[in-house]
Every structure is written in C-alpha cells, then in structure tokens.
C-alpha cells in the first residue's frame, strides 16, 4: 500500500508528467540502425516533444557528455557496442529527466568501455537520481552509493555497498 511519486508527481494521477521525468535505457537500447546518431537523437527529441530551441541547445551538451559528438554523422549500425550504449544513454538524457533508469548498462562491453560507462554513470549521479538494475556486483559497488536488493518484489536489503558486502560476506 501507499503511493509512488516522481519529482512530486503521483504515478497514477499524473502518469504523463511522471514519464517526462524519467529517462530509461534498456539493456539493449532500441536503436534505428539505418539512422545516423544525430538523426536518431532528433527523432527521439521529436517523440518527447522537445521544442526546437531546447533541442538544439541540449543536443550538443548531451553528445559531449556521453562522448558521441565525433560519431554524430555515422550510421548507428556501423558503431561499436560501446558507442551504441552511449547513444542509448544519450536518448535517455533527452528532456533532462531528473531520474534515470539504467538496465545492465555495461553488458557486452569490453573492459575499457565498462570503465568509461561506469565513470559516466557516476558523473550523471551528481545531477540525476539513477536507478541501476544489475546482476554484476562489482559494477554496483563501483557506481552506487546505496543498494536495494529486491527478491520476488520485496526489498530484502537496503544499505551501502560496503555494509552489504560485510553483512552478506558474514553469512
């Protein structure tokens, strides 16, 4: 029982307002492979009804932030897995949502790309609430300040990564 609010908006009473405040990157971002990076991000901006002035201003910032500006004119199908993940993250950032939900953001990346994406997530955590879904415990420890373990829909543990490691290591 209870209610869930995002940025002060109840998810049942004002779902459209809630959706505007959440950016989501699934494990396998649904990218249009025959679009360039810039075309795809413009397409997502249009879907999210971002006005032209805001779109132009924020697009450069987002591409710089996730380090994809140098591939903006390349077709997505010609990008590495790491760059595709960055494009997926960029689309989640469109509209400046205060909450980001990232599902297994480093799956399939090489070690260098994993470090880069983890550092990017930590940086994003300074300005966004990030909900990270991961089964990779070293990743959780590397990027999270707080961890919730959910089993069958129930929160079974909530603490810092360090404290959880100590508690779970002792059992």
Regions found by a protein language model. Give the residues of each.
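Conserved ABC transporter NBD signature motif
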Residues: 2-10, 17-18
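Conserved ABC ATPase "signature" region
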Residues: 42, 46, 53-71
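Conserved ABC ATPase signature
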Residues: 75-79
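A short, proline-enriched helix->beta-strand linker immediately N-terminal to the Walker B motif
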Residues: 94-98
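Catalytic Walker B motif of ABC-type/P-loop ATPase nucleotide-binding domains
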Residues: 100-104
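Helical segment within the ABC ATPase nucleotide-binding domain
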Residues: 114-126
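ABC ATPase "signature
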Residues: 158-159
């Amino acid at each position: 029982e209870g209610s869930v609010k995002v940025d002060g908006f109840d998810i049942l009473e004002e779902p459209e307002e809630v959706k505007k405040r959440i950016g989501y990157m699934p494990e396998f971002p649904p990218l249009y492979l025959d679009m360039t990076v810039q075309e795809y991000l413009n397409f997502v901006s249009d879907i999210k009804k971002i006005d032209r002035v805001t779109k132009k201003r924020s697009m450069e910032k987002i591409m710089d932030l996730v380090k994809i500006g140098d591939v903006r004119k390349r077709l997505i199908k010609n990008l590495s897995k790491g760059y595709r993940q960055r494009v997926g993250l960029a689309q989640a950032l469109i509209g400046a949502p205060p909450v980001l939900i990232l599902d297994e953001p480093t799956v399939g990346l090489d070690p260098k790309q994993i470090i880069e994406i983890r550092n990017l997530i930590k940086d994003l955590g300074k300005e966004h609430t990030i909900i990270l879904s991961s089964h990779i415990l070293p990743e959780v420890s590397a990027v999270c300040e707080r961890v919730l373990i959910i089993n069958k829909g129930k929160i079974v543990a909530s603490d810092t990564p360090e404290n959880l490691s100590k508690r779970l290591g002792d059992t």
